[in-house]
Amino acid sequence: MSPQTETKAGVGFKAGVKDYRLTYYTPEYETKETDILAAFRMTPQPGVPPEEAGAAVAAESSTGTWTTVWTDGLTSLDRYKGRCYDIEPVAGEENQYIAYVAYPLDLFEEGSVTNLFTSIVGNVFGFKALRALRLEDLRIPPSYVKTFQGPPHGIQVERDKLNKYGRPLLGCTIKPKLGLSAKNYGRAVYECLRGGLDFTKDDENVNSQPFMRWRDRFLFVAEAIFKSQAETGEIKGHYSNATAGTSEEMLKRAACARELGVPIIMHDYLTGGFTANTSLAHYCRDNGLLLHIHRAMHAVIDRQKNHGMHFRVLAKASRLSGGDHIHAGTVVGKLEGEREVTSGFVDSLRDDYIERDRSRGIYFTQDWVSLPGVLPVASGGIHVWHMPALTEIFGDDSVLQFGGGTLGHPWGNAPGAVANRVASEACVQARNEGRDLAREGNEVIREASKWSPDLAAACEVWKEIKFEYETIDTL
């Protein structure tokens, strides 16, 4: 290095370590419409001031590192750095704070959920100055939203494709999830669809195993779809799981589904990865396929209250990356989910514009502009007695998915499907007549069961089944 170069590099540079808050804690900062905003729940190590912890989060997830570097002088840190602009204590929790961080839009690649998450939730979650860190919410500015395709089709286009309006869609996950041959699997699909369901589904871990290779399954399922459509006069579908070990194999499976003429496929978007998921979503839009998203692995990330990432963030990521459906809990079933919290991220999936509402866990107003909405899927431990509550909580623009609640019917799969369809239509009719499903729901189901033996049998089997556990992830 020449003396001249050394002199230029050294101008204004002072080596050493300085507090993050001197650069990255800026309570006077006024956020811009183009900023990506993040709300982090942070638990600093003993002795670490919350301002220093919040600034460290902003620094390590944007331009900062642990020491001063001379190359800071070669760019404009004020333009590119993340800023912790507000900190508030969490009520009822000792040494927990919500840190609000603003990121300039230029830090992120357009149309890339992968890059967005690599930056914001990358290395910072292992930072030693923090005992725990959780990303509670993100505000994605319209200028960044518009760089994404989002869902392949969206709610209205899906309804038009299926020619089904004014009620929740009904589905069923085929069980046992592993071990069936392709022919028996297709038989189970056919029975459910002819009984009145709109969809059946591969479980998340059904890929291409020795007992049932993917192509065999796709062929038998397609036969079941077309046979049930011919019998019922309704459009039917099965979420054939295209998730695979490579993106190339995933797209090959999607191409097979397209050639068979089926309406929908499925992807495990967390285990499959955001890059693969976005590629698949683009393929689905180009080729007229609906895309169902399973959230397998989400609880590893979102279950703990003080560390990880809330599902509302993963839900927003799925809308950006692309999916027409995504699993969203049930509130009343066997899986985790508080009602107000669930309603918050369900609205974030479906609506064009969502106001800030901390009572529902919504930290920021979100404008999705032209991005299509996503149907929330209620699935996991639900049965006919849950139908009134599910109809009230999720409304018409949803998929209510009964696996054991269909296949566990004492008379078989088709009667199980009939029971769910009758219960759903009874609840929709009662709601449309002005009845209060929260108060009269059980009576609505009992009345419908008087003229439906299939529903009456289902009511008897599941009359005592409840999943009454305390929710871990509360507001």
Swiss-Prot record:
This protein's record includes keyword Lyase: yes
Official protein name in the record: Ribulose bisphosphate carboxylase large chain
Record PTM N6,N6,N6-trimethyllysine, positions in chain: 14
Reaction it catalyzes: 2 (2R)-3-phosphoglycerate + 2 H(+) = D-ribulose 1,5-bisphosphate + CO2 + H2O; D-ribulose 1,5-bisphosphate + O2 = 2-phosphoglycolate + (2R)-3-phosphoglycerate + 2 H(+)
Enzyme type, top EC level: lyase
GO molecular function: magnesium ion binding; monooxygenase activity; ribulose-bisphosphate carboxylase activity
Site (Transition state stabilizer): 334
Residue ranges annotated as propeptide in the record: 1-2
Family the UniProt entry places it in: Belongs to the RuBisCO large chain family. Type I subfamily.
Remaining remarks: The basic functional RuBisCO is composed of a large chain homodimer in a 'head-to-tail' conformation. In form I RuBisCO this homodimer is arranged in a barrel-like tetramer with the small subunits forming a tetrameric 'cap' on each end of the 'barrel'.
Domain of life the protein comes from: Eukaryota
Main subcellular location: plastid
EC number in record: 4.1.1.39
Gene: rbcL
Subunit structure: Heterohexadecamer of 8 large chains and 8 small chains.
Cofactor note: Binds 1 Mg(2+) ion per subunit.
Cofactor(s) listed: Mg(2+)
Cell location: Plastid
Active site residues according to the UniProt entry: 175, 294
Record key words, sorted: Acetylation, Calvin cycle, Carbon dioxide fixation, Lyase, Magnesium, Metal-binding, Methylation, Monooxygenase, Oxidoreductase, Photorespiration, Plastid
UniProt modified residues of type N-acetylproline: 3
Ligand binding (substrate): 123, 173, 177, 295, 327, 379
Role of this protein: RuBisCO catalyzes two reactions: the carboxylation of D-ribulose 1,5-bisphosphate, the primary event in carbon dioxide fixation, as well as the oxidative fragmentation of the pentose substrate in the photorespiration process. Both reactions occur simultaneously and in competition at the same active site.
One term under GO cellular component: plastid
InterPro entries referenced in this protein's UniProt entry, alphabetically: RuBisCO (IPR033966), RuBisCo_large_chain_AS (IPR020878), RuBisCO_lsu_C (IPR000685), RuBisCO_lsu_C_sf (IPR036376), RuBisCO_lsu_fd_N (IPR017443), RuBisCO_lsu_N_sf (IPR036422), RuBisCO_lsuI (IPR020888)
Modified positions (N6-carboxylysine) in chain numbering: 201
